[in-house]
Amino acid sequence: MAPPLFLLSLQLLVLLSSPSAQAQNISLGTSLTTQGPNNAWLSPSGDFAFGFRPIDGNSSFYLLAIWFNKISDKTATWYAKTSEQEPQPIQVPSGSILQFTSTGVLSLRDPTNREVWNPGATGAPYASMLDTGNFVIAAAGGSTISWETFKNPTDTILVTQALSPGMKLRSRLLTTDYSNGRFLLNMETQRAALYTMAVPSGNLYDPYWSTPIDENVTNQVTNLVFNTTGRIYVSMKNGTQFNMTSGVIRSMEDYYHRATLDPDGVFRQYVYPKKPSSMSQAWTAVSIQPENICNAQTKVGSGTCGFNSYCMFDGSNNQTSCVCPEQYSFFDEVRKYRGCRPDFELQSCDLDEAASMAQYEFNLVNNVDWPQADYEWYTPIDMDECRRLCLIDCFCAVAVFHENTCWKKKLPLSNGIMGSGVQRTVLIKVPKSNSSQPELRKSRKWKSDKKLWILGSSLLLGGSVIANFALSSVLLFGTYCTITRKDVQPLQPSRDPGLPLKAFSYAELEKATDGFKEVLGTGASGIVYKGQLQDELGTYIAVKKIDKIQHETEKEFAVEVQTIGRTYHKNLVRMLGFCNEGTERLLVYEFMVNGSLNRFLFSGVRPLWSLRVQLALGVARGLLYLHEECSTQIIHCDIKPQNILLDDNFIAKISDFGLAKLLRTNQTQTYTGIRGTRGYVAPEWFKNVGITAKVDVYSFGVILLELICCRQNVEMEAAEEEQSILTYWANDCYRCGRVDLLVDGDDEAKLNIKKVERFVAVALWCLQEEPTMRPSILKVTQMLDGADAIPTPPDSSSVVNSFP
């Protein structure tokens, strides 16, 4: 009996030599474009197409892909990836081209004519899109195959396709996001196995499903086969076959077939009717593996769903869903695999038993468990005592009770599952409904520091730099107000417990700064002085003395501060209070021990690459909070190294909101005069157009390059003239494939050259002249984190307009 792979290869050669296939051969010198009618090569029947497929939800970018051409949603079965050790899906912008050159080379090029993908086949006489869904490139002579998509699968296999040991399927991140996902089907010499993976590093956790292993036989697996009857099985060298799927197989004549490793980690075999009907047509899963992925557990990692969530399986449609417990919410409603976070402040370990019982209670949920997350257990015990022991334990977030046994668990919770077979009752600790504890909801949880509580009414917790903006905008936006100082009554100290700002007297701040003696720096609207409060801790502060004041009404100011004053983020400098006494206007901030990024980065000693990476991510996350996580969007308008401060742990914090703009709900742009600092301002500042959050994205792109290279954007004394302006030079280095020149002498960065290239590409996307071409700051953070693939950035001349 011939091995299955040999039979498949023989069948493929027959197809290549048939008249119908030859009629569809792709000739040398042929090309495809992203737009227009010539964007794909079809198989003889028209069932499959190979070419440019628009990204779902973003028609400006394309995959080089194969798809079911006669199905309305054009379901992709293959898409090109990079040739890196951890291949990433390739996305190209409009204007890209795929050439099958006269020398027999298939080459994908972006609008700048830079090659972004090449399968490595040379001297090919022709290529073909076959009716099997396989795209093949013939070897010289035309009798054998040099390269084919069936040997380079992504997340899907088709009928007649086989996977041999060493080949793998990688799930997508989401159905509409083709970035590498969290699950892998790996063909090994001893078995076929499904793994959970770490994103973005790609390391494997424990397998959650595999074929049986015979310890007495080595190299026992031959292939995973999707045969012409619709069966999917793993063939062994001893002749046995292990069925991967066991669904009711539909006919090949009436149905399209595929098998996909889906974003939820389930390997599903699907069918789709070829003939249109009055019924709604869709892919139907006829078989799955594993039968219930919610039962999968890993010793490391979050499990099937993200941390602090639990998995539910619906057997009626073979679908899984991830759920947050009550009073928890997803970090990202779209990317639910990132897990859940509490919508409340976690229990302080300073609370005694009485206080804990007064402030916290439990939500009870049946048939739920988080296996492997317990750190303590008791037996025999009743539920009331289990409840009490968890309630007084500040580490205990959840207690699980079953048959007189109690398990205590702390965050993060992993391997969460709900099902009728889970004979457990969970007690989830939450604040009591009448508790005065504020919910954090969309902001990061503030972990209270015992020393700060000592300050009591002197420094209320949770002060926000956003309140800084609210006050600064009131004091500085003279363009938009006509009310004089005498019309404004001094702001009284807040009696609202939700307004965590202290109203300082001028005398207090004059004493704290020793008569405004030590200057820390100058901002857009005043001078910043170092000070020290006369409290029990001797807290150091930074006091900004505002000049050139113009006001809006006190009522509008109070409403705005009360609206956003409770928010907080680790990457924003925290505002502690203010002074609004007579004609004096001062702002009080937390003091940043390590000064500004400007001084830290350009002082002559190159910081570690790993630290620069964390600083870049911190600035991006701070901007993400301003742009997309606040209830009211904030445009900073003056992002530069001088306005990025570093605390004692070298965490980057955005400061100086004196030029910021606040957008109303549903407002996406504003019109205002030029703001910002030369070398960091976006081109649209010099045009009569609306200003959007993309001006901050542009400024971040400049800072990102400065962090990569440890030099300022403009250095007219540079050794080489082409290196004088960093944005020019970085663009040239990237286009020439020499980003290593940007980190010359930095051994740590060169060891991470792939990440350097990734960061440079992100920066060049941020520096696009057209604002709509720049990614959102959310997309920027995803690309920096490695969660999203990065298309090749167009060659933009935006930097010219940065220096009027």
From Swiss-Prot:
GO biological process, one term: response to other organism
Membrane topology according to the record: Single-pass type I membrane protein
PAN domain location: 349-426
UniProt cross-references to PROSITE patterns, sorted A to Z: BULB_LECTIN, PROTEIN_KINASE_ATP, PROTEIN_KINASE_DOM, PROTEIN_KINASE_ST
Entry EC number(s): 2.7.11.1
Keyword hit for GTP-binding: no
Active site: D638
Record-annotated disulphide pairs: C294-C311, C305-C322, C324-C340, C386-C406, C390-C396
Record: glycosylation sites: N25, N58, N216, N227, N238, N243, N318, N434
Superkingdom of source: Eukaryota
Regions of this protein lying in the Extracellular compartment: 24-458
Family: Belongs to the protein kinase superfamily. Ser/Thr protein kinase family.
Protein name: G-type lectin S-receptor-like serine/threonine-protein kinase LECRK4
Organism (species): Oryza sativa subsp. japonica
Lineage, broadest ranks: Eukaryota, Viridiplantae, Streptophyta, Embryophyta, Tracheophyta
